A protein has these predicted regions:
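Mobile cap/lid helix-loop segments that gate and shape the active-site cleft of serine hydrolases
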Residues: 1-41
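Alpha/beta-hydrolase-fold catalytic nucleophile elbow
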Residues: 26-29, 53, 88-89
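Active-site rim elements
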Residues: 36, 56-59, 122-129
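Surface-exposed acidic, glycine-flexible loop patches that form ligand/cofactor-binding
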Residues: 39-45, 147-152
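Short beta-strand/loop motif that positions the catalytic acidic residue
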Residues: 46, 51-58
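Acidic catalytic loop of the alpha/beta-hydrolase fold
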Residues: 56-61, 92-95
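Conserved strand-to-helix beginnings and helix N-cap segments that scaffold or border functional pockets
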Residues: 63-67
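C-terminal catalytic histidine-bearing segment of alpha/beta-hydrolase fold enzymes
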Residues: 68, 76-156
Length: 156
């Protein structure tokens, strides 16, 4: 374990209201040097349908910034994938479908989220609305994918 890593996380976390914060690590890594093209994930080479999902208030890393960056990269380069970039103002790091989180934690979900993330405490309704919107959009996409698959493979 790198001691400076955890020291920086502790410094950023202190007084933040979050159980843990680590955005400073990503901000510092980008300030330290330019990242070469070889280091960047070639998102345009991904086949299929992509959902790029994140929230502005993610306390672990700058999700929204990276989603905007991926969106821009896809706009500038040829690709065959369908994609949807979903950036929400509130949702915390756990921008997961509400139904998935409820299955993982059927009791105490709101308590846990509010304990871990200050944004979930400050904006509980908005965070829940984000999770429910993600749930609707991903469920609809999976239903469409399943229907397309069944129509394309009638013998299965």
């Amino acid at each position: 374990e790198h001691p400076v890593y955890w020291q920086k996380v502790q410094e950023e976390t202190k007084g933040s209201g979050d159980f843990e914060r680590s955005t400073c690590l990503f901000i510092d890594s980008e300030k330290a040097r330019e990242h070469s093209e070889e280091e960047i994930i070639k998102i345009e080479n991904i086949k299929g349908k992509l959902f790029l999902v994140g929230a502005e208030d993610d306390s672990f890393w700058e999700t929204a910034k990276y989603i905007h960056r991926m969106d821009q990269r896809l706009k500038e380069r040829p690709h065959t994938c369908e994609y949807e970039a979903l950036v929400y103002e509130h949702g915390t790091h756990f921008v997961l479908p509400e139904s998935l989180l409820r299955k993982a934690l059927p009791v105490g979900l709101k308590f846990v989220l509010r304990f871990v993330f200050k944004a979930a405490k400050d904006y509980p309704g908005e965070c829940e609305a984000t999770r429910k919107d993600i749930d609707r959009k991903l469920s609809a996409a999976l239903k469409e994918w399943r229907e397309d698959f069944v129509n394309d493979h009638p013998s299965l």
